[in-house]
Amino acid sequence: MDTSQKTVAVVIPVYKSVNQLANTVSELINTIESSTEFKDLNYKLNKVILVDDGSTDGSNEVISELILNPVITSITLNRNYGQHAAIFAGVLSTNEDVIITMDEDGEHDPLIIPEMIRKIEKDQFEIIYAKFKYKKTDLKELSSVYAKKFIGSISRDPNIKYISSFRAVKGTIFRSAAVYANNGSFLDVALGWISRKVSTVETTKRITQRRSTYSLRGLVNHFSKLFFAAGIKPLIFLFNLGWVVSLGSLIAILIIIYRKVFSSIPVQGWVSNIIVIVFFGGIMISSIGLVARYLSSIVETSSGKPFFTIKNQK
């Protein structure tokens, strides 16, 4: 083998995907092994790591069959820790030059992997995300896009809007992020601690028959974690919002005083009371909730709560 040849590891978190996993892995390996662009870049698929994140549908049995292929290895977590914890568990078992992460349900097209590798190798980027094209009627995906844009704007991190679970990252960058990450960390925010050299490759998310394992509550928790992982900037945003709301309440009160003194429009006394209560009550509740969420993250980290624990590794 060419000693200068670089290696790639693909980490796939697995959760309740008994019907999709085998096809996804087979397509991945066949696509990469038949790619002339991949070979021209002098890269080799060295390892596919399947991380079972507490599946209860028989996915572990499929994994047991797949690991008969020497390229495929597996990690089984003790319970369901979440996608990011599963990915970090896989990343920490790698030593490859580039690490790819993708979903197990077949929505991610492996055909763009050589292009992702090319951007790292030739264009000197360190983090590459798949940029999905969505239909304007896809409310779930569009809400995800706008949520990331909103969080990116208040955290002043322009790269947050690019994040997706289909990514290619230089191995040294990903492993460094995995070492520093903890329960309060959001994977892509952690990557941003290490590198800002981010780019994208455009693709289309494929339609599969699998139902999403994310409930509405799970999606809210997912973006809540991203929001709080953005550091102290949301606190600064809330502080500025408090000033804006206070100014708005002051203007509303001045309007009421003007109408009371200079016009014949009757103003009920309870109107001003409600304005004050709503504005300042809302600010206090938001502030208390925000601070409480930060404190809970600090407590979880300081108490030594594990990010993940491994049951076995093959």
Task: Give the ranges of each region predicted by the language model.
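Short aromatic/hydrophobic "clamp" motif used to bind/position activated sugar donors
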Residues: 99
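Hydrophobic helical membrane-anchoring modules
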Residues: 2-5, 19, 189-314
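A conserved acidic beta->alpha catalytic loop
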Residues: 52-60, 106-107
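Donor nucleotide-sugar binding loop of glycosyltransferases
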Residues: 17-21, 55, 109
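Acceptor/aglycone-binding surface of glycosyltransferases and processive sugar-polymer synthases
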Residues: 77-79, 83-93, 110-185, 206-217, ...
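Short beta-strand/loop segment that forms part of the nucleotide-sugar
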Residues: 37-54, 76
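Cell-envelope/extracellular polymer assembly enzymes that use nucleotide-activated donors
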Residues: 7-9, 47
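Short, well-formed alpha-helical segments that are part of the catalytic scaffolds
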Residues: 17-38
